[in-house]
From Swiss-Prot:
F-type ATPases have 2 components, CF(1) - the catalytic core - and CF(0) - the membrane proton channel. CF(1) has five subunits: alpha(3), beta(3), gamma(1), delta(1), epsilon(1). CF(0) has three main subunits: a(1), b(2) and c(9-12). The alpha and beta chains form an alternating ring which encloses part of the gamma chain. CF(1) is attached to CF(0) by a central stalk formed by the gamma and epsilon chains, while a peripheral stalk is formed by the delta and b chains. Key component of the proton channel; it plays a direct role in the translocation of protons across the membrane. Gene3D superfamilies: ATP synthase, F0 complex, subunit A. GO terms for molecular function: proton-transporting ATP synthase activity, rotational mechanism. It is a multi-pass membrane protein. Keywords: ATP synthesis, Cell inner membrane, Cell membrane, CF(0), Hydrogen ion transport, Ion transport, Membrane, Transmembrane, Transmembrane helix, Transport. The lineage of its organism: Bacteria, Pseudomonadati, Pseudomonadota, Alphaproteobacteria, Hyphomicrobiales. It is found in: Cell inner membrane. The chain crosses the membrane at residues 26-46, 84-104, 114-134, 143-163, 193-213, 216-236. GO terms for cellular component: plasma membrane; proton-transporting ATP synthase complex. It comes from Rhizobium etli (strain ATCC 51251 / DSM 11541 / JCM 21823 / NBRC 15573 / CFN 42). This is ATP synthase subunit a. The keyword Transport applies. Coiled coil: none annotated.
Length: 250
């Protein structure tokens, strides 16, 4: 295993594929994107395939996840937001599963790749724009015109709102990417201290106790962050979808 804390984020080809000079290689990132989707879908399928009146653990988790996102959508976008439940629920489960899989040794954390998180953010913003214009036409542009703004300040406020809207995919993607990247690098550094000090013998083993405690604590924290980042991504998605459903409502 490499001592470089950034080595874990390198994209490596598993099956090299080149078509017309374009690289379509199947990589470790491709593998774990597929694995994240498969694990999330598989868990939901098997946990609900034999539904019981008194649910077991897996069924309870699946039902709690469903209700969690449904309530989040109702609070963030109103009852009309429930039409986007498949999108938000799929994003939440995919991001959460990808984050959790990345916690295991030798596994790849796809949410530590800015291109992956940016693609997810673009999917969200594209949905907002397409639905907003489809449902409201050019009245959707009212999302850039907050109510109660004095006329003299309106041009400035509209410009700020447009810039804020355009920055959403950047902030949405960078937030997830940066948190997963920083957390895994920190965890790798402390784990490296444990291995390096342990290799020094008895004295080193004694000195490795503190880094080991920090590694265990950070591991627990990273599992919490894995959930929180999926939660934040879903919450912000609901907020953005609310603009498409109720433009000019802020």
């Amino acid at each position: 295993m490499s001592n470089d804390p950034t080595h874990q984020f390198l994209i490596q080809k598993i099956v090299p594929i080149e078509i017309g000079g374009i690289d379509f290689s199947f990589t470790n990132a491709s593998l774990f994107m597929a694995a994240s989707a498969a694990v999330a879908a598989g868990f939901l399928y098997f946990s609900t395939s034999n539904r019981a009146i008194v649910p077991g653990r897996s069924q309870s988790v699946a039902e709690m996840s469903y209700e969690f996102i449904a309530n989040m959508l109702k609070e963030g976008a109103g009852k009309q937001g429930l039409k986007f439940f498949p999108l938000v629920f799929s994003l939440f489960m995919f991001v959460l599963t990808a984050n959790l899989l990345g916690m295991f040794p030798y596994f790849f954390t796809i949410t530590s790749q800015i291109i992956v998180t940016f693609a997810l953010a673009i999917l969200v913003i594209s949905t907002v724009l397409i639905y907003g214009f489809y449902k409201h036409g050019f009245h959707f542009l009212n999302v850039f015109v907050p109510s109660g703004v004095p006329g003299i300040l309106l041009p400035l406020v509209v410009a700020i709102e447009i810039i804020s809207f355009l920055s959403r995919p950047i902030s949405l993607s960078v937030r997830l990417f940066a948190n997963m990247l920083a957390g895994h690098i920190t965890l790798k550094v402390f784990a490296g201290f444990v291995a390096s000090l342990g290799a020094l013998g008895a004295v080193g083993v004694g000195g490795a106790v503190l880094p080991l405690i920090m590694t265990v604590a950070l591991t627990g924290l990273e599992f919490l962050v894995a959930f929180l980042q999926a939660y934040v991504f879903a919450v912000l998605t609901c907020m953005y979808l609310n603009d498409a459903i109720h433009p000019g409502g802020h």
